[in-house]
Design a protein with these regions (language model features):
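Active-site-adjacent structural elements in enzyme catalytic cores
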Residues: 9, 13-206
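Intrinsic disorder/low-complexity segments
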Residues: 5-6
Length: 206
């Protein structure tokens, strides 16, 4: 009986892995073609695309009906990736990312190699190193940062779970990730800090 349960558990995990791999491949393929996806992150479900593709980013703004002067954050798979998209990564950023007990979004000045629409004042950009395995792999397979913005029309409540996302949003994206659609685990929003090149920190959200 115990052997059967172990075998069954392995089979289930393998099935989940296969489904996840197909999900990842499809999502990456869609983004490489300039498409927009709906996907789970380490906080809430988000709308995403290749953050270096200006046309794809523009699609996200249109789907959300979001003002073009409002910046959006991006996700990367590991801290070292930040160096490709920011002129100077302050030493403090590595410490904050390592020591923070919850997901942390760091706003840096002088962004590089990203769609201009994503940037705020001083060419600033919010970047978070994802702590969620699916999103980490998504970033690594795409080899680009991914836009992450809540899956709602601007001004409406941000959905905490997949089944709270409106049909309007679901029908507007090019691909909906299957992974974690039934997950009801609550996820806290990320901390948000602004970090200057001289390591000065301003906490925007604890």
């Amino acid at each position: 009986m115990q052997f059967f349960l172990i075998f069954f558990d392995i089979a289930v995990k393998r099935a989940i892995f296969v489904v996840m791999e197909e999900d990842l491949k499809t999502a990456v393929e869609v983004m490489r073609k300039g498409g927009v996806i709906l996907y789970p992150t380490d906080t809430i479900w988000g709308i995403g695309c290749d953050a270096t593709n200006a046309e794809a980013v523009d699609k996200v703004y249109k789907i959300k009906k979001r003002a073009s002067n409002k910046a959006m954050l991006v996700l990367v798979g590991k801290m070292e990736d930040v160096e490709n998209y920011v002129e100077t990564v302050p030493e403090m950023a590595y410490q904050l990312n390592e020591l923070s007990e919850k997901p942390i979004t760091i706003i840096y000045d002088n962004a590089l190699n990203l769609a201009q629409e994503l940037l705020g004042d001083n060419s600033s950009v919010g970047i978070r190193v994802s702590r969620e395995v699916f999103t980490q792999r998504l970033c690594r397979m795409l080899r680009k940062p991914i836009v992450s913005t809540s899956a709602n029309i601007a001004g409406e409540p941000s959905p905490a779970f997949f089944d709270e996302i409106s049909d309007e949003i679901k029908s507007a994206v090019d691909y909906i990730v299957k992974y974690r659609q039934d997950d009801k685990t609550p996820h806290a929003p990320s901390s948000v800090v602004m970090l200057s090149a001289d390591n000065t920190i301003k906490i925007l959200r604890p």
